[in-house]
Amino acid sequence: MMGALQQQSNGHGHGVLLLAEAGYAEVDPTGRYGRFNEILGKGSSKIVYRGFDEWRGVEVAWNQVRLRDVVRGGGELERFYGEVHLLAALRHRGIVRLHAYWVDAPRRALNFVTELFVSGTLRQYRERHRRVSAAAVRRWCAQILDGLAYLHAHSPPIIHRDLKCDNIFVNGNQGEVKIGDLGLAAFRRGGGHARCVGTPEFMAPEVYDESYDELADVYSFGMCVLEMVTLDYPYSECSNPIQIYKRVISGIKPAALYRVSDPVVRQFIERCLAPAARRPAARELLDDPFLLPLEDDGFFSGDGGDGHGGFGVGYYNLMYNYLHQPACIDDHHACSNGGLSPSNSVGDNDVDAAVQRGDDDGDNWLRDIHMLFDEDDDDAAAADANERVGGVDITIKGRRTDDGGVYLGLRIADKNGTGRGRIICFRFDTEADTAMTVAAEMVAELDITDHEVTRIAQLIDGKVAALVPGWRPGPATDDDDDDDLVGGGDDPDAPGGAAAACCKNCRPAASSSSSCGSLVDFMSSAAAAERHGCRRCAELHGRFEEITFQADDDEEEQHLQGSSSDTGGSNHEQHAMGKDKEVMNINGIAQDGTVQGSEQP
């Protein structure tokens, strides 16, 4: 396929018409890239237009830099062009990809085409999303530093010279940030002498003296972190560049820095803003305590940058999972699982953080049940019910909270078959549940072998009876569960029959004083509802949290997985990464510090 410019120069005189039909205002010398008049961004010396790559069929960013302020003559133009040629060879996950570049000498402009980021710049993204966790800011910082370290590792080092949040670009759907706007980047010259270029608020003191190296980028990065944390532009208290210049060369830090009350965050920023002789390199900053995973993360919302505000990441993940239950099909189903458990499995570190903050027992039950299976007390183990069926060990443990709640955990280990095991944790309602309904619900939603249902129910009965004195087990199993169905039973044409509304939670509003059946009603009727074809509630609700592990004889290596009974039992297990390193995936974030990408829907 020929590009627009290639068609223009084919000698048939139709070039102008073809260019107009494509809607381009300009094309590159090869005819591959076309520029539209739509402006995506504008800086002091650069304008970014929306462009199109005809060969790949994707939109790109067409950057146009005016060289009249940075190019003095033909010799410097050639030298600058050579540097840009080397920049085109940069390939790093933290650097915006440069696809093509060329100098338009008659117009004294440098054009370069880069990948397009639909989420815009980090400054725009942060303004749109004013409340983000400290963990998110740390991940952004780590990616930016990684990109800077890559630039500075070249020989000679590449200095960005204009690093700021406006020149850092975001892929919001993947949580990735990349350093862009390399139009002013330069190689460090011998003796450290260079031109004074950049944005005054982000320029290091030595830049004003025109004697700087790659550490000037680290200073600019520190100002970026300050803006990320406080949502304030550095030196916003100043009204003109002269005031900024006087403060910078006098060593006066931005006023926003003194509103950062978190000592770790503030110390990290101050390290970046230190005098050049004491300023660490980008690679060194990657080991700073601020970038290490913490058990308790706060939030940065521009309210002083304290990074706390009363909520930690454990609480946040618990509440996020609790609130983001799958929506019901009908309006009268606008209810979640009532807080019996989060919708996604919560990692140990999340729940540990909740324990350290002193949350109530209702938030800690998953961790407590999990810990019961780690106990080595022989007497305690002997007191728990155990069963071995066809090479499968089944153990049940539980506890009763001060408010009377009963929480159980069922450990199923197949030592003769796949060698895999699972711990299923759930809450048992002694006033509404029976062991058989819960066991049937578990089998239906978690794909447990049918022949184990009766034995599972017996184990549940025995454990609940041990935890709740005077509690009487319910009936083993019969058709009584069908009484939970509304109307004409199996007759789909009967009023209120299965076809119309086969369980209490799905019945029409007219059949009840409440438009949504109680959660207890649903929990006790879900299994029966599924047998009668009502898959809406059975698939969209659930109480079970599941932990998988490798069932070894003497040792278990457990791996949390982000699934619950809400997913209909579709589990994706994480395999062992070795005894010395175990990676958990919580809310799409690998806990070893890496960020996992996700496919767009």
UniProtKB/Swiss-Prot annotation:
Residues at the active site: D181
Protein kinase domain ranges (all copies): 34-291
Assigned GO CC terms: cytoplasm
Keywords carried by this UniProt record: ATP-binding, Kinase, Nucleotide-binding, Serine/threonine-protein kinase, Transferase
Annotated spans, Disordered: 470-498, 551-601
Cited InterPro entries: Kinase-like_dom_sf, Prot_kinase_dom, Ser/Thr_kinase_AS, WNK_Ser-Thr_kinase
Compositionally biased intervals (Basic and acidic residues): 572-583
Gene Ontology molecular functions: ATP binding; protein serine kinase activity; protein serine/threonine kinase activity
The protein's Enzyme Commission number: 2.7.11.1
Top-level taxon: Eukaryota
Top-level enzyme category: transferase
Polar residues bias locations: 560-571
Gene3D superfamilies, A to Z: Phosphorylase Kinase, domain 1 (3.30.200.20), Transferase(Phosphotransferase) domain 1 (1.10.510.10)
Catalytic activity line of the entry: L-seryl-[protein] + ATP = O-phospho-L-seryl-[protein] + ADP + H(+); L-threonyl-[protein] + ATP = O-phospho-L-threonyl-[protein] + ADP + H(+)
S-S bonds: none
Keyword Transferase included in the entry's annotation: yes
Residues annotated to bind ATP: T114, E115, L116, F117, K164
Compositionally biased region (Acidic residues): 477-493
GO biological process: intracellular signal transduction
Family: Belongs to the protein kinase superfamily. Ser/Thr protein kinase family. WNK subfamily.
Name under which the protein is recorded: Probable serine/threonine-protein kinase WNK3
Source organism (scientific name): Oryza sativa subsp. japonica (Rice)
Taxonomic lineage: Eukaryota, Viridiplantae, Streptophyta, Embryophyta, Tracheophyta
